[in-house]
Amino acid sequence: MQGAQIDMFGVGERMITARSEPVFGGVYKLAAVEDDEGNIIPKIKVSENVEKITIPHFKKVYRFYGRDTGKAIADLITLHDETVDDTQDMEIFDPMATWKKKTVYNFAARELLVPIFLSGKRVYDSPTLPEIQAYCRQQVDTLWDEVKRFDNPHKYVVDLSRKLWDIQQELLRSSQR
C-alpha cells in the first residue's frame, strides 16, 4: 500500500464495527458455485449466531397470496429448479423451528425474482421511479394490517422448501466433521 504501515489486524465485523452492535444488516455471501461440468456445488457460511448461517444453493422465491383476499400469506424460498403447484394444498414449516407447520390452501403462487442478466446480456427493462413506488405501495397493501402494525406485529412467514432445508442441514452436519 505504497508505504502505509499496518498497525492493526481484525476479521470481519470485529474490525469494522463493534462486535456487539454490528451495523451491516445484509452482506453478500457465496451460495453456490458451478464446476466445469455444470454441476452446482452449494456453499454455506456457518456461524455461532444462527441468524447469520446462510441459505445455500441457487434459489427462487415465491410469494403465496390468498385467492379469496389477495393478501400475502407467506414466502417460500426454494431451489432454483423447484416449482410450486398452487392447485394443491402445501405444508410449509419454519426453518428455525421445524415443529411450527402451516398448511397453505386456496393460494396463488408468484415468483418474486426476475432475471436481470442472462448469459452476460441484460434482459430486463428497468422500471421508472414512479413505477417502482407504485409497485412498492401495491405490495405493502397485500400485507395484513397485523403484520404492518408497529405494536406487537404478527411475524410474516418466510420458509424454506424441504429440499433446500435438507441441503442446508447436510452442509451444517458436514461442517462439524
Segments and roles (model prediction):
Residues 1-177:
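Gly/Ser/Thr/Ala-enriched C-terminal appendages of enzymes
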